[in-house]
Amino acid sequence: MATTQAQIQRPIANFSPSLWGDQFIKNDPGAKAAEKHCKAVEELKKEVMNMITAAGSNLVEAMNLIDTLERLGISYHFEKEIDQKLKHFFNLNKDYSDESYDLYTVSLHFRLFRQHGHRISSDIFGRWIDESGKFKEGLKTDGKGLLSLYEASYLRTRGETILDDALEFATATLNSIAPHLESPLSKQVVHALIQPLHYGNPRIEAHNFISIYEENQDKNEFLLRFAKLDYNLLQMLHKEELNEVSRWWKELDLVSKLPYARDRVVECFFWAMGVYHEPQYSRARIMLTKTITMTSIIDDTYDAYGVIEELDIFTEAIERWNMEEMKKLPEYIQPFYKALLELYEQFEEELAEEGRSYAAHYAIESLKELVRSYHVEAKWFIQGYLPPFEEYLKNALITCTYCYHTTTSLLGVESAVEEDFEWLANKPKMLVAGLLICRVIDDIATYEVEKERGQSATGIESYMRDNNATIEEAVAKFFEIATDAWKDINEECLMPSPYSRDVLMRILNLERIIDVTYKGNEDGYTQPEKVLKPHIIALFVDPIKM
């Protein structure tokens, strides 16, 4: 007797519905308001350009201005000028052992140079080490300097013991003195201890810093007004894009056709915006949002609905990548398969016009690799098989989706050439580091939920069995893996590099999204209410008051 749909036992996950409904479809970004903001921003840009010029060769003044521009989220208007200044200052090879440079200043300069790829030595912090090899006790009263040191230490690479010690010292001391600091420094410290700047989403960090800068007695009113106007102007653009992808998603009607899957188009756009927020990446954001949304459905089909016979057929259909395969598929997944292939047909047509049709090819091949790995995991689950950790990790580095999302993040980036896609396809060190962070942080956040759903082949379980470890030891090891991987990413971002900084920043920013989404060991994508909702409201709903 044939098995009916009613008889099939499915691993239903019962995901929560979207928090947003049609909110962003009904939203009117306001073209007139955007035009008004645009004119004001252009005027203020001239003022800021004059400030950059006026700073001239004054190292301390110029570096403080650059830091303020970056933290207010407006530095993208002056990338060329900032890069030129930083290159000039770095080549001066300043002697930071000079007592006139305090801890705040040295830490700030170190962080800015490293953020922009300049290979400045961490030995410059040696003058604050005492005879016992520890940071001097007298620093514990310097809250501003310690915060600057704390933020700088996150740019560390492997083997930089002085920065490992700096982070440990600064973290412990800031936690101790935070309640006794005055605002706005106290607010900065509390925020930084939760979300280090280097790991944070640039737009979220800009939103936070604008409110802190407003409290600063030494604030520059021009910069503050510029930052607020620019933030609201970018928000209008992002709302337009979110409106477009929300309409696309609603027209596909996959929410009603595939009710088992997570309805997270808004959260997917949040991820895409985290990869690149600047106006010139508008098309790239829309393309990436669509690919993330479709991947989410594939993930849920393998992880939370499909049975192995169906998944065998679906895996083969993706491998063949032909519309003729649709009729072989289970009826429920046919509309999705059709929509997926049509989406990539649109991408191919659009990219062919600019001579970049190869980009779609690399994305499709990466998706096939992802689906093959999902299929392996599904078979493990059905068989109740717990693989050795090494075997688990090899497959799980692909199913974390980071490899595919990195590839598709370049679809709409015109400067991304075929060599960049080939580089990613060969799994370079920086990408592998990103895969590791994504995998272990996701595993920590989702372990308990997956265990409740009967998932045996989890990374935590595999590591615990192989190493006879407790869950606490496994989690500690996973955080250690993530920490070392971040050091590798920092190293790979330093010059000289044969690869485009535009491409490297996509990998870095995707990593930052992971840090934000899984903050506090929460799965902010599956359950966005606590972690992502406040960020989405700040970024896409509420403008900053002028």
From Swiss-Prot:
UniProt KW keywords: Lyase, Magnesium, Metal-binding
Cofactor(s) listed: Mg(2+)
EC number(s) per entry: 4.2.3.199
Cofactor binding comment, as recorded: Binds 3 Mg(2+) ions per subunit.
Catalytic reactions of this protein: (2E,6E)-farnesyl diphosphate = (-)-5-epi-eremophilene + diphosphate
Enzyme superclass (EC): lyase
List of residues binding Mg(2+) 2: D299, D303
InterPro entries: Isoprenoid_synthase_dom_sf, Terpene_cyclase-like_1_C, Terpene_cyclase_plant_C1, Terpene_synth_N, Terpene_synth_N_sf, Terpene_synthase-like, Terpene_synthase_metal-bd, Terpenoid_cyclase/PrenylTrfase
Top-level taxon in the UniProt lineage: Eukaryota
Record pathway: Secondary metabolite biosynthesis; terpenoid biosynthesis
Family: Belongs to the terpene synthase family. Tpsa subfamily.
Quaternary structure (record): Monomer.
Free-text domain note: The Asp-Asp-Xaa-Xaa-Asp/Glu (DDXXD/E) motif is important for the catalytic activity, presumably through binding to Mg(2+).
UniProt name for this protein: (-)-5-epieremophilene synthase STPS1
Organism: Salvia miltiorrhiza
